[in-house]
Amino acid sequence: MGLLSTVLAVGVNLQTHTPVSEVSSTPDSEGYAAVKTERGILRAKKVVYATNAYTAALLPDFEGKIIPVRGICGHIVPTEKPTRSLSNSYIIRQGALEYDYLIPRQDGSIIVGGARSRYFHDKNNWYQNVQDDELIESAESYFDGYMQRMFRGWEESDASTAKVWTGSK
């Protein structure tokens, strides 16, 4: 039995895609916190915050303690030309603070993240930045031709970047 099944079986009310705008700082007379959401106010004896980069927005005590940083990832898709498949996840370290990571998918595509050398010099692009709705422009093309540059046996492949996105952690 998975974790989700286990917690639902004991009555946990798991809310997903439900932004919380406020949590009461003191419980009511029955020991419940009021959790204000777009769906209404929920009552909870325990609240678990799973917010990563956005923690300080709900918990001001964490301002300056949890600092959001932005990164960039790409989805590389091989074409019909034969390529060597990757059977493991990889970290490619190019310097002390410069590395990329690759996660092969079952369909032969690859998730790759990194590109730090393209944006690290401009702190506003990544430090204390939660702008997930816009790409880091200076790194947007980093994954183009990545497999051809980095892996033997991929030089003649037509593997290309299908998608690029950014995220905060």
Task: Tell where the protein language model's regions lie, with residue ranges.
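Helical element adjacent to the flavin cofactor pocket in flavoenzyme catalytic cores
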Residues: 1-45
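General beta-strand structural signal in soluble alpha/beta enzymes
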Residues: 14-16, 37, 49, 112, ...
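Residues that flank catalytic or metal-binding motifs in active/ligand-binding sites
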Residues: 16, 31, 70-72, 98
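Short, solvent-exposed loop/turn segments at secondary-structure junctions
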Residues: 21, 54, 117-119
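Active-site lid/adjacent beta-loop-alpha segment flanking the redox-cofactor pocket in flavoenzymes
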Residues: 61, 65, 80-168
